[in-house]
Amino acid sequence: MLVRDKVGEEIQRAIDKVADSDVEVQMLTNEEFFDAIILKIRSELDVLEQTKSLDSLAEIMELVDWVQVALGTTNIQDVIQNRADKLGLYWKKYYIKEKAGK
């Protein structure tokens, strides 16, 4: 499961819990937001260091992309095109190498 899927599930679960209650949902402060993102990135880097797998690398890349889109610094179409332009051949080359090496 990719980060995007997990985040979407957690947000929907939180929305469902507060839908019928009188609760106000507030954004975290900038410091708390960045602390959470940094913690998640460190966690994913630890996994990548242990597994050295493309799936772990994809999780980190998707997390960065999701943050950029969520903050409005880029749009999803730009992210998709950027990945296709810069990583398509690279990704395919190393994916095939990893599978063949097993």
What is each stretch, according to the model?
Residues M1-K102:
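Flexible "arm" and connector segments at domain edges
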